[in-house]
Design a protein with these regions (language model features):
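Auxiliary Fe-S-binding modules of radical SAM enzymes
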Residues: 1-214
Length: 214
């Protein structure tokens, strides 16, 4: 399927100067293929459909890191996310650590026991699963979670647990990461009170499909 899409992309770009047809990030993840280069996303016109979210995140992290001078301050963080996004978050943290060599980090893949293990998106992870899988485990100084784990505009998970409930259970401050790469970098490096706050409902859209968006 992806090869057919790529053939049509080449044809459309040659004839009309736009690739027009795209596969969501999930297709590339499930196929074990690299995401397309940034130019093939035509300016990210279909982010709301899960097309290019992870490539854009990678680009935003790279640019955000380039703007910073770097330091050797010790930092220790844990990121909790879904199975699909975990490898890409790991790559983003590797980029950050190139300028911040004393950054210690771990990406923990949260298994979805609440809705079923076939659900691998972060947007359907509940507070209960976070609490059960992070408790009694060595964690960083703070735990980062993507904002799409929470109900829109609230600090409440789908199972009605609050961020404070989970934070108290695991004994760590929880930092909510908004859906852009700059905020991920800020969440990793900056004091929480100085963290840049943004809101963009694009990265890792909540999905009820068996595998879902990244």
């Amino acid at each position: 399927v992806l090869e057919q899409i790529h053939r049509w992309q080449r044809k459309m770009y040659k004839e009309h100067g736009i690739h027009f047809i795209h596969a969501s990030d999930e297709w590339y993840i499930l196929a074990g293929l690299e995401l397309p280069e940034e130019e093939r996303y035509d300016g990210y016109l279909q982010l709301e459909n899960g097309v290019g979210m992870l490539r854009l995140l990678d680009t935003e992290v790279r640019l955000a890191v380039e703007k910073r001078t770097g330091d050797e301050k010790p930092r220790s963080i844990t990121v909790a996310t879904g199975k699909l996004a975990a490898p890409y978050i790991e790559k983003c943290l590797e980029k950050i650590s190139t300028k911040y060599p004393n950054l210690e980090y771990e990406v923990i893949t949260i298994r979805n026991n609440f809705f079923g293990e076939k659900i691998t998106v972060s947007g359907l992870i509940t507070g209960t699963d976070l609490k059960e899988q992070l408790s009694n485990r060595k964690l960083g100084e703070r735990v980062l979670i993507p904002c799409n784990m929470l109900r829109s505009g609230e600090n409440v998970f789908l199972d009605d647990l609050t961020v404070d409930d989970v934070s108290k259970a695991i004994g760590r401050e929880i930092v909510i990461v908004e859906e852009d790469g700059e905020d991920l970098v800020s969440s990793v490096l900056d004091p929480v009170q100085n963290k840049k706050q943004t809101r963009r409902q694009m990265y890792e859209q909540t999905s009820s499909s068996n595998s879902g968006q990244a």
